[in-house]
Amino acid sequence: KAQEPWFGIEQEYTLLNSVTKWPLGWPKGGYPAGQGPYYCSVGAGRSIGRDIPEVHYRCCLHAGIQISGVNGEVLPSQWEYQVGPVEGIAMGDQMWMSRYLMYRVAELFNVEVTFDPKPIPGDWNGSGGHVNFSNRQPESPPAGKQSRSSAKKLGKRHRWHIAAYGEGNERRLTGKHETSSMNDFSWGVANRGCSIRVGRMVPVEKCGYYEDRRPSSNLDPYVVTRLLVETTLL
């Protein structure tokens, strides 16, 4: 507890047509134009189902969940919301409640939600549950050295973490579509293709966070946050 572990989780998900079980707004039995124009987009045909994440955002605020943002993702009809920063085990509490609210909101629109890490096979992005992590250490080394030390510890237990980071994650962690390969461990500054991404300003400001990009969208937040603390702080 003295370390004050703080977490922020980026929860990605995909909206599905409740009848066809195909992504919302996609041609029946077909595909939309390729990825590129959908990420953080605006406009009909690009930003699909926006009402759902916006209503969900407001529900989370009313429920006391520390939701901190929403954005459209790379796959059309894929969205993300962020919860945090939250300290310790409360991260798991808030993430599970936010998921419940997402299901309830989507129900009102007669839309289904999937947290599958690779809802559409092929040349399409999967869905992750990236975990941002930081902690307070009064006598800690500079953040750059601390990040390197944590990365080395995480690298030694890479397979252990991968086994607990979500069901079906092997379909997502291929080394393509802004992921690292699940068979290799890597870290870097502002690099989305790494297992661990260190914030761009960490080397400059000598403080900050790092992002574990390996967890899938169906991660158990209690398990993942516990593993990060066990591996890097205990």
Swiss-Prot record:
It catalyses: L-glutamate + NH4(+) + ATP = L-glutamine + ADP + phosphate + H(+). Residues 126-157 are annotated as: Disordered. The keyword ATP-binding applies. Belongs to the glutamine synthetase family. It is an enzyme of class 6 (ligase). Residues 1-234 form the GS catalytic domain. Homooctamer. Keywords: ATP-binding, Cytoplasm, Ligase, Nucleotide-binding. Pfam families: Gln-synt_C. GO terms for biological process: glutamine biosynthetic process. It is found in: Cytoplasm. This is Glutamine synthetase. Its EC number is 6.3.1.2. The keyword Electron transport does not apply.
